[in-house]
Amino acid sequence: MRECISIHIGQAGIQVGNACWELYCLEHGIQPDGQMPGDKTVGGGDDAFNTFFSETGAGKHVPRAVFVDLEPTVIDEVRTGAYRQLFHPEQLISGKEDAANNFARGHYTIGKEIVDLCLDRIRKLSDNCTGLQGFLVFNAVGGGTGSGLGSLLLERLSVDYGRKSKLGFTVYPSPQVSTSVVEPYNSVLSTHSLLEHTDVSILLDNEAIYDICRRSLDIERPTYTNLNRLVSQVISSLTASLRFDGALNVDVNEFQTNLVPYPRIHFMLSSYAPVISAEKAYHEQLSVAEITNSAFEPSSMMAKCDPRHGKYMACCLMYRGDVVPKDVNAAVATIKTKRTIQFVDWCPTGFKCGINYQPPGVVPGGDLAKVQRAVCMISNSTSVVEVFSRIDHKFDLMYAKRAFVHWYVGEGMEEGEFSEAREDLAALEKDYEEVGAEFDEGEDGDEGDEY
């Protein structure tokens, strides 16, 4: 088996996790108490969904997941929520006092007390796997726990499970919507370790997802539940090929192989289509070509950056539902002829496609319509650098005055870590610039000849 262990850190990680596990359960027909009436092989078996769920002798399906937070309120919601019987109590780890939006508390003072317990639980889960494939890590980098404890856990996972791939689903601060003043500090410090300790990192930001909810689902005031349900569709599409059998399956390691040209250039944009409300879906049926086009629309991107400002290095299209390879090839061929979608010249093919015949599931009473086919795109584009340069700029404004720095130093950090992390990000911006600029040397007028 190729099992994956999910690790949900901090409030954002846990709430996205709730949405994901709810959706997985619906897709596999697993009840909130973990029973699965449709499962023929009780107590084990080699079903595809066993990559994400382990089975007990009594036929209960338990998620291979750990939820960690430094304060109890968010995890208590899981403990008392609809899916409380699904999780093993040991999988829900909460501390007593939170990180107070402070990276240093999450990484040094409070975080280090809880990190061994987490690793112990993760070790138990991994002992339960026959062929652990890797980790999916969910966190946000604006707060204290997601950024501080998140990077601490990633660092320790690298030590304990060096060769296993780590996929990060990371919520980055939005340009306009901010939840804390020190977001830029936490993000920069955290990205410093994401750079080294994740293999692929998928960037999400709330503002972009708010806009998608407003525009495509006509929700005037989207809540976090609305956002998380949309994010969970993306994550479900990515992991569908691990959980179901399909025509063109995609392994976790394949993301890395196909999307990451250089180790540091591993921050991805994601988009999902069709995002469509039930009222609209009733009247229209979307073709493969249409959903593929809308996945490339700048407005579909789940992070606030415009792919037209950069070049694509590679992208991965995961289709699910009623889709055949012939349609996919035609849709991709059309995309390649578009002048607005530019690829770097050293990566002429640039497309990795996966097809899964299981149609996308939806949460009953949710906002998304049940559709016959959907596509999720993960793309590596040089425009991601916009996300970093925005955060770096805000970081510089605050750090020039050393504002709020004493809170970090007081928790045992050194000021040098700030400048070290900031330099690392400056180097990252430069890396992206070089990767995108490699073709301006010899070609001035004939950029279109790579097709």
UniProtKB/Swiss-Prot annotation:
Site annotation Involved in polymerization: residues: 451
Cellular compartment(s): Cytoplasm, Cytoskeleton
Post-translational modification, as annotated: Undergoes a tyrosination/detyrosination cycle, the cyclic removal and re-addition of a C-terminal tyrosine residue by the enzymes tubulin tyrosine carboxypeptidase (TTCP) and tubulin tyrosine ligase (TTL), respectively.
Keywords carried by this UniProt record: Acetylation, Cytoplasm, Cytoskeleton, GTP-binding, Hydrolase, Magnesium, Metal-binding, Microtubule, Nucleotide-binding
Residues binding GTP: 11, 71, 144-145, 179, 206, 228
Keyword Nucleotide-binding: yes
Reactions performed catalytically: GTP + H2O = GDP + phosphate + H(+)
Residues recorded as bearing N6-acetyllysine in the entry: 40
Class of this enzyme: hydrolase
EC assignment: 3.6.5.-
Active-site residues (renumbered): 254
A GO MF label: structural constituent of cytoskeleton
Cofactor(s) demanded: Mg(2+)
Annotated Gene Ontology cellular component terms: cytoplasm; microtubule
Keyword GTP-binding among record annotations: yes
GO BP terms in the entry: microtubule cytoskeleton organization; mitotic cell cycle
Record-listed Mg(2+) binding positions: 71
Record's function text: Tubulin is the major constituent of microtubules, a cylinder consisting of laterally associated linear protofilaments composed of alpha- and beta-tubulin heterodimers. Microtubules grow by the addition of GTP-tubulin dimers to the microtubule end, where a stabilizing cap forms. Below the cap, tubulin dimers are in GDP-bound state, owing to GTPase activity of alpha-tubulin.
SUBUNIT field: Dimer of alpha and beta chains. A typical microtubule is a hollow water-filled tube with an outer diameter of 25 nm and an inner diameter of 15 nM. Alpha-beta heterodimers associate head-to-tail to form protofilaments running lengthwise along the microtubule wall with the beta-tubulin subunit facing the microtubule plus end conferring a structural polarity. Microtubules usually have 13 protofilaments but different protofilament numbers can be found in some organisms and specialized cells.
Family, as annotated: Belongs to the tubulin family.
Name recorded for this polypeptide: Tubulin alpha chain
